[in-house]
Amino acid sequence: MYQYSAFRSRLSAGAVRVALVVLLGAATSTLDAQQPQDLVRQVNRSGPRFGVTWLGGSIVDTLRSRFDIDVAPVVTQFGWQFERQFASLENGPVALNEWIFLVGGLDQGAFLPSLTWLVGIRTPGNFEIGIGPNATPAGVALAMSTGYTFRVGALAVPVNMAIVPSKYGIRSSILTGFNLYR
């Protein structure tokens, strides 16, 4: 058990370092080029989100022992993402601020709320990456997310993957949703 815990800690620390280097590198390279007159309006990409989360490690056991919540290792997620971009250049990357409120386990008669705040970047090609705190009944952790937004007519359809390593195990999610493409 100790070897797994040490490996998971090194893996989590390495993933956080990589995510921070990518975010900082992308942010600093574009901030130098920005002029106030080049900045464009903010875009609201808030909308419903839904998907699934895999609960790894001892998360299922922790929920059972601490909260008397009995769920399978895979739970559905439903919720809302509030998203704003900070600023962007006409054809440059966008700095993002996202709050994601989800309720998991409804398919199993459980209520597992989570709140995640992500700060990240979306490229002109609609690829995005973000990192930030996550709070659930099982505790707090650091969430790392990446995804791509497809354009389907007047809709923006994001597909995001997130990994949340915690002391109880790793949660992995795939979420999608929609909002108006503005």
Each language-model region and where it sits:
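Outer-membrane beta-barrel architecture
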Residues: 81-83, 118-120, 145-149, 175-177
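Transmembrane beta-strand segments that form the barrel wall of outer-membrane beta-barrel proteins
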Residues: 94-105, 126-137, 155-165
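Cleavable N-terminal export/targeting peptides
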Residues: 1-41
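Short glycine/proline- and aromatic-enriched beta-strand/turn motifs that initiate or cap beta-hairpins
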Residues: 33-79, 179-181
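Residues that define the transmembrane beta-barrel architecture of outer-membrane proteins
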Residues: 72-78, 111-115, 136-142, 155, ...
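Mid-length scaffold segments of soluble, non-membrane domains
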Residues: 102-123, 128
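Outer-membrane beta-barrel "beta-signal"
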Residues: 168-182
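Outer-membrane beta-barrel channels and translocator barrels
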Residues: 87-89, 124-126, 151-153, 181
